[in-house]
């Protein structure tokens, strides 16, 4: 893949790649959060929430890939290490031990961060 020729300023390229990597990290952590909640949700609203969390993690996974490809297009290096994504992300991981209401609240907070 070649770099975008209109972005000839290396500083601008690095800043854009860094901002996109921040988005990749937050999207990746949100993706895993949604998948974790998909696996572990219980309660009266299990069915709809199980489906909702699946939709979120599938959509976010696709978005994460698009962001990483844009990083490469501006000449950057896409963060591919889970530890790097977790340390960079403003979205926090969760172990999945939460009520359905707590999961909804955490997912809304993660979406707002994105």
Regions found by a protein language model. Name each.
Residues 17, 50, 54-57, 61, ...:
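Non-membrane alpha-helical structural segments and their capping/turn regions in soluble enzymes
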Residues 9-15, 81, 99:
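General structural signal for secondary-structure boundaries
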Residues 10, 45-54, 93-102:
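Glycine-rich tight-turn/loop motif centered on a GG-T
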Residues 19, 65, 69, 86-114:
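Acidic/histidine-rich alpha-helical segments that form the ligand environment
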Residues 12-41, 103-114:
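Alpha-helical bundle segments that constitute or directly flank the non-heme di-iron/ferroxidase center
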Residues 2-8:
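Short, charge-rich amphipathic alpha-helices with coiled-coil/heptad character
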Residues 41-84:
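Conserved alpha-helical segments that form or flank metal/cofactor-binding pockets of metalloenzymes
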Residues 35, 82-87:
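Mobile beta-alpha loop/short-helix "lid" or hinge segments that flank ligand
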């Amino acid at each position: 893949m070649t770099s975008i020729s209109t972005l000839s300023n290396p500083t601008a390229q690095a800043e854009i790649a860094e901002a996109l990597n921040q988005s990749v990290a937050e999207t990746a952590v949100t993706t895993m959060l949604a998948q974790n909640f998909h696996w572990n949700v219980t309660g009266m609203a299990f069915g709809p929430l199980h489906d909702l969390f699946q939709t979120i993690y599938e959509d976010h996974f696709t978005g994460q890939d698009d962001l990483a490809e844009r990083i490469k297009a501006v000449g950057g290096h896409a963060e591919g290490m889970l530890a790097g994504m977790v340390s960079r992300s403003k979205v926090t991981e969760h172990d999945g031990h939460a009520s359905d209401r707590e999961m909804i609240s955490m997912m809304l907070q993660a979406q707002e961060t994105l």
